[in-house]
């Protein structure tokens, strides 16, 4: 009896704001964290935490940890600041997805999970959004 091993897939949660980028890879249920990294772990200056370069470095680190745990592919969930803030993700989001694919992880579906208010609180004064 030869049993085929099932491909293990995870979810890559990418929170990309204009100040920082955070990448977390969990199992399919989202209950167990397999790997995580943020901008401050790969660059020295605070201003570089949200840069595409930092996002690529984080994605390489996270992908290596995930591949060591047997994850073969990920579904990507990109999130911007949301709420009354910007609904577009920061500059690190696109670089993260590219770097995850380059690092050897198979990319399934990519979805935007930025929270949108259904007429929530009043926006801050002088907000250009």
Curated annotation (Swiss-Prot):
Part of the 30S ribosomal subunit. HAMAP family: Ribosomal_uS11. One of its GO terms (cellular component) is ribonucleoprotein complex. The gene is rps11. Belongs to the universal ribosomal protein uS11 family. InterPro entries: Ribosomal_uS11 (IPR001971), Ribosomal_uS11_archaeal (IPR019961), Ribosomal_uS11_CS (IPR018102), Ribosomal_uS11_sf (IPR036967). It comes from Haloarcula marismortui (strain ATCC 43049 / DSM 3752 / JCM 8966 / VKM B-1809). GO terms for biological process: translation. It holds the Pfam family Ribosomal_S11. Keywords: Ribonucleoprotein, Ribosomal protein, RNA-binding, rRNA-binding. This is Small ribosomal subunit protein uS11. The lineage of its organism: Archaea, Methanobacteriati, Methanobacteriota, Stenosarchaea group, Halobacteria.
């Amino acid at each position: 009896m030869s049993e085929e091993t099932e491909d293990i897939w995870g979810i890559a949660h990418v929170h990309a704001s204009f100040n920082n980028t955070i990448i977390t890879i969990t199992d399919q249920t989202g209950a167990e964290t397999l790997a995580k990294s943020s901008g401050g772990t790969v660059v020295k200056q605070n201003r570089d935490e949200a840069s595409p370069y930092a996002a690529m470095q984080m994605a390489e680190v996270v992908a290596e940890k995930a591949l060591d745990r047997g994850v073969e592919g990920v579904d990507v969930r990109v999130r911007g600041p949301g709420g009354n803030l910007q609904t577009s993700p920061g500059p690190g989001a696109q670089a993260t997805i590219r770097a995850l694919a380059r690092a050897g992880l198979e990319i399934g579906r990519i979805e935007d999970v930025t929270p949108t208010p259904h007429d929530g609180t009043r926006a801050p004064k002088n907000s250009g959004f």
